[in-house]
Amino acid sequence: KKGVLWWSIYRILEEKKRKPKYLILENVDRLLISPNTQKGRDFAVILSSLDQLGYAVEWRVINAAEYGMPQRRRRVFIVGYYKNTDIYKRMRKSKPMDWLFSEGLFAKEFKVQQPQVLFDEHYLDYISIDSDLKKVTKSFNLDNFDRVFKNAGFMIDGQTYTTSVTPSFSGELAKLKTFLEKKKVEEEFYITDDDLEKWKYEKGAKAKT
């Protein structure tokens, strides 16, 4: 379960005397809107936890197909920067719009369309996340507003900014055959006739009894 997994990660980080300088976490994009009855609470708990541990965070939902790869799969990537790193200090000095659209890790590596807006507050949603995990768990988004966390954002000192971004890609679209092995596939990767029926059963639909 994702909740159990997160607390295992949190415990490991909490017990480390020398915190990792950088964290990279990945999950299905549904994390940003779960649970159904309190949308965004699970992600808010993660952000609050990382803030307690001394991390600034940026996240982005990325669909590989929108950047030229032959796979349609949306995932949310979460990157944390510990407070003694240069990038943490740069985040503190940066304007939210600049970080999310040009200066941040994701903005540099996964380009997005630049919005035509005059003021940051017209395009960004601001969220203040409590440092008390119990309060976050009990009271975050009790009105259950939809999509509190958009597909991009960052958090530092509990101050969170989030917005919707649109991918910008003009490169060549890769095809699946580009990544296929050209050399002969070894026999161990083939399914024998004897095993085929077993595979069909294991992969097929099953009626509950």
Regions found by a protein language model. Give the residues of each.
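Class I S-adenosyl-L-methionine
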Residues: 1-209
